[in-house]
Amino acid sequence: MANYFNTLNLRQQLAQLGKCRFMGRDEFADGASYLQGKKVVIVGCGAQGLNQGLNMRDSGLDISYALRKEAIAEKRASWRKATENGFKVGTYEELIPQADLVVNLTPDKQHSDVVRTVQPLMKDGAALGYSHGFNIVEVGEQIRKDITVVMVAPKCPGTEVREEYKRGFGVPTLIAVHPENDPKGEGMAIAKAWAAATGGHRAGVLESSFVAEVKSDLMGEQTILCGMLQAGSLLCFDKLVEEGTDPAYAEKLIQFGWETITEALKQGGITLMMDRLSNPAKLRAYALSEQLKEIMAPLFQKHMDDIISGEFSSGMMADWANDDKKLLTWREETGKTAFETAPQYEGKIGEQEYFDKGVLMIAMVKAGVELAFETMVDSGIIEESAYYESLHELPLIANTIARKRLYEMNVVISDTAEYGNYLFSYACVPLLKPFMAELQPGDLGKAIPEGAVDNAQLRDVNEAIRCHAIEQVGKKLRGYMTDMKRIAVAG
């Protein structure tokens, strides 16, 4: 099979990369009615599989789970989760032939095997659903021409998808129809009904493409969402300890600092995050972020280039074929780092202390968010898509680090995201070491003293922060998410 994106001509590539339309709430007036009375079979009962299924059932849909025979016979975790929640569970052979919509929510590396198994069992004219388009775009999976292929991609972990639904809300969601597989022209109706059934229509839905979702998702998770947080954690911890900070305190400042800082980001973008600093600290954070952007821009561009060309995917799939040798080696090495093995700090760190003593961390967040956004937009991805794959998801990933450090982040994210994270962080850490050596007192671990600032300089910095394109689009998109619950649990 050939990478689907690479089979397109340039005009087609640009058209699919640039497909992004914010959908009006009136477009979801029919809710999930298009799928009511039809059989929806979910393959996979992980975080997305279970929680999307719970939401869809609560929205009145007929949901069941198709699992492998051995998973049922051995009563594995997927079988236990589905049965304990009262769902009908059966084998592929028992459930797939009756399904009107088969939703594949297994891990990326299992998609080819799953699709090749279920496709011959699917009835004529059925639909196949994904929540991530890697299998279609990067693997180039060929789907029977009578099958409609759609995507509904919530921009949150599965647990958040469920919690927001229970609150009567939802999470921002991308939907798409694969242009090669919409024989009856019903793909958009199916995707809209599925999105409504998960509650996504209450938080904002973007009509996108499989290509735009995959390329932007890969870029975001590799760079700012996971790679930058991992590289920043390791670099900042080592710097603090090198300068005499208690390792336990240093670990807590970083582990919970990302979450506290990005909670401000979630509520009011980069502007609010920077406004939490004193004026001297804001000017310093801005200067540091500009330096970081200049240093890291080529690395961000390389990741985007490798994602667009398919180089990243081919390398990762080669590692799949080699029993994940690189992934497992990197995972083991990360677990042995000083940050991951540092003792726990029993004292309390106040919320403002994370800002006052984390100026460098704030600069890293600002630089990483802006670079990821700018690089995606420069590559043809529309601003709304770039926002969701950079700034929007960052607080959610930071929250995983607050639970159990980098270990938890890498457990929760997909293997695809984890592989890309290591590629980025292993390149970024040595790249930034000379920069780290030149830091000034007050950049990390100590507060910058209050002092006089130049009014014109402060005015210009504030203007530059607020006028960045990500702040403009973010203000609009956050307007649809004002009811989402607060994430941070740091203390």
From Swiss-Prot:
Could you say which cofactors this protein requires? Mg(2+)
Q: Name one Pfam family in it.
A: KARI_C
- UniProt: NADP(+) binding residues: 45-48, 68, 76, 78, 108-110, 158
**InterPro entries registered for this protein in UniProt:** 6-PGluconate_DH-like_C_sf, 6PGD_dom2, KARI, KARI_C, KARI_N, NAD(P)-bd_dom_sf
Residues where Mg(2+) 1 binds: 217, 221
GO CC list: cytosol
A GO BP entry is: L-valine biosynthetic process
Per its UniProt entry, what is the enzyme's top EC class, as one word? oxidoreductase
- Write down how the cofactor binds this protein: Binds 2 magnesium ions per subunit.
Keyword match Metal-binding: yes
Where on this chain does substrate bind? 414
EC assignment: 1.1.1.86
Q: What catalytic reaction does the record list?
A: (2R)-2,3-dihydroxy-3-methylbutanoate + NADP(+) = (2S)-2-acetolactate + NADPH + H(+); (2R,3R)-2,3-dihydroxy-3-methylpentanoate + NADP(+) = (S)-2-ethyl-2-hydroxy-3-oxobutanoate + NADPH + H(+)
Residues that, per the record, bind Mg(2+) 2: 217, 389, 393
Q: Name one GO molecular function term.
A: magnesium ion binding
Domain KARI N-terminal Rossmann residues, every copy: 15-208
Q: Where, by residue number, is the active site? A: 132
Record keywords, A-Z: Amino-acid biosynthesis, Branched-chain amino acid biosynthesis, Magnesium, Metal-binding, NADP, Oxidoreductase, Repeat
**What function does this protein fulfil?**
Involved in the biosynthesis of branched-chain amino acids (BCAA). Catalyzes an alkyl-migration followed by a ketol-acid reduction of (S)-2-acetolactate (S2AL) to yield (R)-2,3-dihydroxy-isovalerate. In the isomerase reaction, S2AL is rearranged via a Mg-dependent methyl migration to produce 3-hydroxy-3-methyl-2-ketobutyrate (HMKB). In the reductase reaction, this 2-ketoacid undergoes a metal-dependent reduction by NADPH to yield (R)-2,3-dihydroxy-isovalerate.
The UniProt entry, under NCBIfam families, shows: ilvC (TIGR00465), PRK05225.1 (NF003557)
- Give the matching PANTHER family: KETOL-ACID REDUCTOISOMERASE, MITOCHONDRIAL
What family, per the record?
A: Belongs to the ketol-acid reductoisomerase family.
Q: Can you say what this protein is called?
A: Ketol-acid reductoisomerase (NADP(+))
- The organism is Shigella boydii serotype 18 (strain CDC 3083-94 / BS512)
Whichever gene encodes this chain, its name is ilvC
